[in-house]
A protein has these predicted regions:
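Non-catalytic, surface-exposed connector residues within folded enzymatic/regulatory domains
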Residues: 35-38, 61, 123
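Residues immediately within or flanking Cys/His clusters that coordinate Zn2+
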Residues: 38-41, 47, 64-67, 73
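Short connector loops/turns at beta-strand edges and beta->alpha or beta->beta junctions
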Residues: 46-49, 159
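Intrinsically disordered, low-complexity, compositionally biased regions/tails
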Residues: 50-52, 76
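Short linker/helix segments within small regulatory modules
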Residues: 55-62
Length: 247
């Protein structure tokens, strides 16, 4: 007889998912009490099943049903230690180490064999611990499969002059250089800076979405500055094919 499975949730950061992690979790498991003994079930003679014979129009039919006395284990309690329940079991606190591979997905279930509840009886085997993965939302990175997305906001001046910016990745901060004249909506692809593939080699990419931030309020001098730009040929939009959004 196999013991029942236990189910828990483990919350992981995007960095832990990207790099893989070992987690120690505390669980309450049913275990056989120390000193407990079992003997063969007298109802089923240790088979765990009750054979029934019925007369039908086709002749005598034999069927097997689970023994109600031992619940199919073939054994019943002989010596019950103090504190144990009617099946000789105790509820015990246990710490389980779980190795979580890189690239797991929110909602995925991992199995830790033999770390579930034990079952009564000398020939029983413990159930499994089922671990459900729960991904913690990242402050600045959004996951899409193995790729990651990052929204980078820059000013008009930074877009016109070019700028070096520090951005978040799952392996730490990196600095990227934006060329002068970069357009809002431009997507920069950082190869291999995404999430590792769980079942194959390689990593996804990090897609940096460039957004030119427009100020909502301007003082008098700033308004005059931008009004001059309205008639400047260099500030009249002349989008090239590579600048246009793909919609």
């Amino acid at each position: 007889v196999k013991g029942s499975n236990l189910r828990i949730k483990v919350k992981l950061t995007l960095e832990e998912i990207a790099n893989g992690v070992e987690k120690k979790v505390k669980v309450k498991r049913k275990v056989q009490a120390s000193g407990v003994t079992y003997r063969s079930c007298p109802t089923c003679n240790g088979s765990g099943q009750i054979m029934k014979v019925a007369n039908t129009i086709l002749g005598r039919m034999q069927t097997a049903t689970t023994c109600h006395t031992c619940s199919g284990s073939g054994q019943i309690l002989d010596q019950k230690p103090a504190g144990a329940d009617a099946q000789g079991m105790l509820l015990e606190d246990d710490t389980v180490s779980i190795k979580i591979p890189a690239g797991v997905v929110d909602g995925m279930q991992l199995k830790v064999a033999g770390k579930g509840n034990e079952a009564p009886g000398t020939n029983s085997i413990p159930g499994d611990l089922i671990v459900a993965i729960e991904e913690i939302e990242h402050e600045s990175l959004k996951r899409e499969g193995e790729n990651l997305h990052y929204d980078l906001y820059i000013s008009f001046a930074e877009a016109a002059l070019g700028v070096s910016k520090e951005i978040d990745t799952v392996s730490g901060k990196v600095r990227i250089k934006l060329e002068e004249g970069i357009q809002s909506g431009k997507i920069l692809r950082l190869k291999g800076k995404g999430i590792p593939s769980l079942n194959s080699y390689g990593n996804g990419d990090l897609l940096v979405h460039v957004n030119v931030w427009t100020p909502k309020t301007l003082n008098k001098e700033q308004k005059q500055f931008f009004e001059k730009m309205l008639t400047d040929e260099n500030f009249i939009p002349k989008p090239e094919k590579s600048d246009k959004s793909f919609f």
